[in-house]
Each structure stands twice: as C-alpha cells, then as structure tokens.
Amino acid sequence: RVLGYSASKAAMENFTRWMAVEMALKFGDGIRVNAIAPGFFIGKQNKDLLLNQDGSLTERGQKIIRNTPMQRFGEAEELNGPIQFLCSDSASFVTGIVLPVDGGFSAYSGV
C-alpha cells in the first residue's frame, strides 16, 4: 500500500549504517551517525487519517493502536530523550543504529 514510504525508510536505515561506517573509518570516533525511527505521532500531516472530527479513532487509528503494545500514539516530546541520548557522551560508542521510538510497534508480531 505504501511502497514509496517503505522503500524510503529502508533506504534511510541502510544509508545510516553505511554513513556510520564511512565516517568511523575516516574520522574514528569523532563523528557518529545514528537515526531515530519514530512510530505513530499525531500531527498535521496524519491527524485526519487517525482521528475523527470528534477526537475518536478512525478505523486506521484503531488498527495502529491494536498493534502498538503501549496502546497509544507517541507525544512529540518523547523524541527528546532518545535524541539527547544519541547526542550525548553516554552514546560515545554507538554508531550505525536506527533507534525505534514507537511504543513497541516494530517489535510486535500480533501474537
């Protein structure tokens, strides 16, 4: 259903890994390359797809929540912690990862 979107996400993940290797080989630990993979966050772009006018979930919104172990959408502020971690000295030996911030959506198999 969303071939272009899926292909672009896969490309970004592979690019992140490739760039991490290239930068580490050229600059050692001076440049780290990581990414975050946000799950479902309600914003202007998707609000009408996920919420009805009265604020209840659309069919698509319900399906997403059913497949998100934390049973909710993310809040934009919840991206701050993972970003700060990846930029901090605590992640000084972390490079080439794509960190999901998705309430467990990517880990859930529906079982």
Model-derived features with residue positions:
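Short C-terminal tail/terminal secondary-structure segment
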Residues: 83-84, 95-111
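A glycine/serine/threonine-rich, flexible loop-to-helix segment
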Residues: 40-68, 78, 108-111
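Alpha-helical segment proximal to the catalytic Tyr-Lys
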Residues: 21-26, 92
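Active-site helix of classical SDR
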Residues: 8, 16
